[in-house]
UniProtKB/Swiss-Prot annotation:
The keyword Amino-acid biosynthesis does not apply. SUPFAM superfamilies: Prokaryotic lipoproteins and lipoprotein localization factors. It is found in: Periplasm. The keyword Transport applies. GO terms for cellular component: periplasmic space. This is Outer-membrane lipoprotein carrier protein. Pfam families: LolA. GO terms for biological process: lipoprotein localization to outer membrane; lipoprotein transport. Keywords: Chaperone, Periplasm, Protein transport, Signal, Transport. Monomer. Coiled coil: none annotated.
Length: 206
């Protein structure tokens, strides 16, 4: 009887050739940023603090560099728009708009981090965190102690960001899963402009 080892070895080699390994997560982050001048995606968000969970969902749109629209549709309506200079936060239920300089708020929003060309690399030290399931993960730790997020994890597949996990200075753990992503589709400039509706309170967050 012939030994099975050569056959098993050949099968393993063939399997490896048929399913090449993904690039590292850091390399995929760079490819994701450089390869998507615009991005639109649905998202589902879960925030956990001391055992309590809050879930929300909505839509993200990005136009690099620096413009984004992060819109919550469930369970409440909230709109966050970065027009490149000013960050606008519109709480419809409160009839209130908060306005602040976008540059000062880059570290406080996942969308702001994603909309820049290299904001994450500029503000965080990146390390490979290995593969879990079918995602390659990186771990990002802040270079400065006053950053809003104390830790960020990002999971990629085929140069596309699938999931973010963030821990902030208040002890909140946030998990964001992206779906229905479209890269480099035309997005109207009006999507990244905001004018406070009549009758709402406008406060400065600077």
């Amino acid at each position: 009887m012939k030994p099975l080892f050569p056959m098993l070895t050949a099968a393993a080699i063939a399997a490896g050739l048929a399913a090449p390994a993904q690039a590292s997560a850091v390399a995929q982050l760079k490819a994701f940023v450089s390869g998507s001048k615009t991005l639109s995606a649905d998202f589902n968000q879960t925030v956990t603090n001391k055992g309590k969970r809050e879930e929300a969902s909505g839509r993200l749109e990005i136009a690099r560099p620096g413009k984004f629209r992060w819109e919550y549709t469930k369970p409440y309506a909230q709109l966050i728009v970065g027009d490149g200079k000013t960050l606008w936060i519109y709480d419809q239920d409160l009839a209130q708009v908060t306005r602040k300089a976008q540059g000062a708020a880059l570290g406080s929003s996942p969308a702001a981090l994603l909309a820049g060309n290299n904001e994450i690399e500029r503000s965080y030290k990146l390390n490979e965190a290995g593969k879990q399931g079918d995602l390659e993960w990186l771990a990002a730790s802040p270079k400065k102690q006053d950053n809003t997020f104390s830790a960020i994890r990002m999971g990629f597949k085929n140069n596309v960001l699938v999931e973010m996990q963030l821990t902030d200075s208040f002890g909140n753990d946030t998990r964001i899963v992206f779906s229905q992503q479209r890269q480099n589709a035309a997005l109207p400039p009006a999507r990244f402009a905001f004018a406070p509706p009549k009758g709402v309170d406008v406060v400065s967050g600077d």
